[in-house]
Amino acid sequence: MGSGHQIITLAGILLLSFLFLTVNKNNSERASSLYKSGSVIDANGVAQSIIDEIQCKAFDENTITKSVWSSDSLTTPNSLGPETGETQNTQFDDVDDYNNYSTVITVGNYGDFNIHTSIKYVMNMSPDNISNSQTYSKRIEVAVTNFSYPDTLKYYHVISY
């Protein structure tokens, strides 16, 4: 085999090696993208389940057994959170009990999802604006983190009385 054949053979081996490395890199990137997409889908499910759980509760501690005719009768913004003795979400009986609630939910291949909720009064006709006083609308914010994505995913839902 002459030196010309050796050079062509070597070039062919290098080209084939480059092709295999490129295909392997593309497959790895695709698998990583699929994994991240799957974890975001599961994060959506986890956040929605927390929102659904919160929506099943009374709007306010003062609306559990009676109607409220004035927003001034609702829990003050500084008092949002669980009442004395309510230490677990199974004991929560109204929406604002979930203010500053944190938990970890483990989902299959995607590991732990760290959940943090925040409840705020918002302007009735402008739910993006936080209110410093009681209103008939509360915004639920669910923040979800997971090791597979660098950012915190935030989900919002407004509930009104």
Predicted region positions:
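Active-site histidine-acidic residue metal-binding/catalytic motifs
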Residues: 1
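Aliphatic-rich helix starts adjacent to a transmembrane/signal segment
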Residues: 4-48
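Low-complexity, Gly/Pro-rich coil/beta segments used as flexible assembly/activation regions
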Residues: 41-161
